[in-house]
Amino acid sequence: MTKVAINSKKAPKAIGTYSQAIKKDKFIFLSGQIGLDPNTMNLVDGINNQIHQVFQNLIEVISASEATISDVTKLNVYLTDLENFALVNEIMKEYFAEPYPARAAVGVASLPKGALIEADGFLVLD
């Protein structure tokens, strides 16, 4: 099977030379999402809102790939301030059920458009 680009009109358009996701066989690779409102392409205000927007954007891309958030097996989270790590954990519980995906949380100096958080992931379909 060839790789297929996945794009959702309900998630922010790519701001570079990448697809929102790529599907190959039973694997889906999600590009990073930041807290962009897909209607305005502007960042939502504050870390709390950005975390929610990131997960909502990921869900829209996942839905466009005919999968669900429960198919996420690995999640990578990038934070400009690791003091927000506990808040990410708290909000993740609203979107993911146990068993939670494997995850990395990485502190970074900056993110595109001045975002406070970015997340990407990997899915395996049955």
Describe the function of each predicted region.
Residues 2-126:
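Short, polar/acidic, helix-capping and beta-turn segments at strand->helix junctions
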